[in-house]
A protein has these predicted regions:
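Conserved phosphate-binding loops in N-terminal lobes of ATP-dependent enzymes
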Residues: 3-90
């Protein structure tokens, strides 16, 4: 029996965070899990690049849920990207 290699992709956007978990099946990519959550990161950035506490908590709770969904996916097979909102943070 061959091992199924799963991969995870995390998109940390200014408005919402997305997670996709996929695997190869019979030469095709098959999405096995997908989740999107509105976080409002960009709207939560205050003066001087500080993040509003409520938005920070919402983002952390979302990332905890993503972590649970990524169980079983090797860390080296997970990629995460952040948008401009992360560059604006101090």
């Amino acid at each position: 029996m061959t091992e199924v290699a799963r991969v995870g992709a995390v998109d940390l956007g200014s408005n919402s965070f997305h997670l996709v978990v996929a695997q190869e099946s019979q030469g095709r990519i098959q999405v096995v899990d997908r989740i999107k959550e509105r976080v409002g990161l960009g709207a939560g950035i205050q003066r001087r690049g500080q993040l509003d506490e409520e938005v920070a908590e919402r983002a952390l709770r979302c990332l905890e849920r993503f972590h649970e969904r990524l169980r079983g996916v090797p860390h080296r097979r997970i990629r995460a990207v952040g948008t401009k909102a992360f560059r604006d943070l101090r």
